[in-house]
Amino acid sequence: MLYTLMEVTLNDLDKDGNPVKYYIEKAVRRAYRDASSHVLSIEEGKNDSKKNPFIKETAISKVVDEVQNISGDYECWHKHVCKDILMGEIYQDKNVDYKEEDRRFSYGIAQKFVNMTIKYLVILYTVMKAMDTDKANRNYIKFYEKNLKKYEQDFHIPIDGYILESVSKDKAEILKNVIVKEKKKVKAWSKWEENDYNSFQAELKKIKAKDEYPLDWEGKTWIEIAKSRKEKIIYKKLTHST
């Protein structure tokens, strides 16, 4: 499972023998792919952020460093990292005249990058904790328990189409701040500004049970929508074949 998700096994080490940094970087790289694969794809004639590999590597390095040095209030840390990704000079080429249709980093993409990084770090910890047989694993477990575990109730829910679909079915009223009125539909998460994200995330956390971890709620909800989508595809194929 870990190899499929992040191309790691439980005994992996980086070239410097630092398993903690190695595992964090693998999680960050997978999260970057999740956040950018569909909305930052290369296209001729576009000023796309993904065209420059330096941008990608700088962003990944930044998040790896921030995770290793996480401290203080989680909300402040999260906002700081998202803004650094978004507003840092690596994404702000002053010689480029960006247009609305150009696919570049938004706060919506930054949040998914950061939030999926955390989600993958939680997955790594959960698996390693259940299979604690290797020194490299124990080093990562110690890092997580010292630096991240205390924030588990504060972790943000990664916002994507699956979460928006779930909310639109049962709690549509909390989408009011991200509705594009002239189009009468929800703004794509990849286009969200900071205020869009903050207001929605705050409302989203009210949905879960008080003692439920945000990422537990997200995982359960995401799977429900994934199953629903798959069932619709199967039903469509069956009805069209008869």
Per-region residue spans from a language model:
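C-terminal accessory module of base-excision DNA glycosylases/AP lyases that mediates lesion recognition
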Residues: 1-30, 102-145, 149-242
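Phosphate/adenylate-binding glycine loop and adjacent helical scaffold
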Residues: 1-104, 134-137, 141
